Amino acid sequence: AASHAAALCPPIKEKNMFQAFLIKYGEIGVKGKNRYVFEDDLVDRIKRVLENVEGSFVVTKEKGRIYVEAEGEFDYEEAVAALQRVFGIVGICPVVIVEREGFEELSSHVMSYVREMYGGQKKTFKVHTRRAHKGFPMESMEINAELGGRILDEFPEMTVDVHKPDVTIHIEIRGRIYIYSEVIPGPGGMPLGTNGRSMLLLSGGIDSPVAGYMVAKRGVYIDAVYFHAPPYTSERAKQKVVDLAKKVAAYSGPIRLHVINFTDIQMYIYDQCPHDELTIIMRRYMMRIAQQIAEDTGCLALITGESIGQVAS
């Protein structure tokens, strides 16, 4: 699940130039009047994961954008890795923030940015401006054309490609100006807790933790139950389940893991039931026990790692 969710951070030529991230989100943007609830949940989750990152951060929300700004020095890689574990984020953009002044000042900042990031490289590029603050004296298309021309003059090794450029230099003009060109992929999905809580039947295989990850990605908090049957299942097997739960919890938030001693039930079924039906009867009782725990803990659904047509073990 982890490798599926979080792509490696792309190379940034000079990480020290970045003190902030613009956070892009996907599905939340199509919500209606309650969109702010999902945005607030996402902001809270971002704040929570950044508590474990070296450095101090301020997370703000502004007109369809979420910004993470570092106050002083911080661990860049650690911050990116933490944000890549937050469901609801589709993109993490390292940004340079400058004060909103005139066009000449903006041009100077953009030239410095391109020099640091792509100086000497044969790249195709385009400039994309979003002028949210209409008080800026030039329109978006005008800014794109003028900055594109200046980049060509300053960096003759670069060429324009407005259809499939190697680099898109984004400029967002708001209360301040945000400059960025890299978009680090996030896991997507919905913010945790926006769709209730469910109980995961967790085993030592790969299917159930992946199922838990996929449901958590839809905004569902996860609890888990594991059926332990010593001496037929070892302590090592139980520890493997605990380790898997920790891996899922890196994305889903804290997981309450319920460990059920299943030995007596398993032996009773073995003694009393037809042996060709043992597997399905044991699974039936696992479902019943998981359902009872789910009802007692406020979980609204059960999650399993089963596939249609799969042979049970």
Task: Show which residues each predicted segment covers.
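Short linear segments in intrinsically disordered or otherwise low-structure-confidence regions
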Residues: A1-A2
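Conserved G/P- and acidic residue-centered "switch" motifs that form tight phosphate/ATP-binding loops
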Residues: G205
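Active-site adenylate/phosphate-handling loop in enzymes that bind or generate adenylated species
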Residues: E146-I151, E157, G188-N195, F262, ...
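Conserved residues in the N-terminal Rossmann fold of short-chain dehydrogenase/reductase
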Residues: V259
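RNA-binding accessory domains that recognize and position tRNA/RNA substrates
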Residues: K13-M199, P209-I255, D264
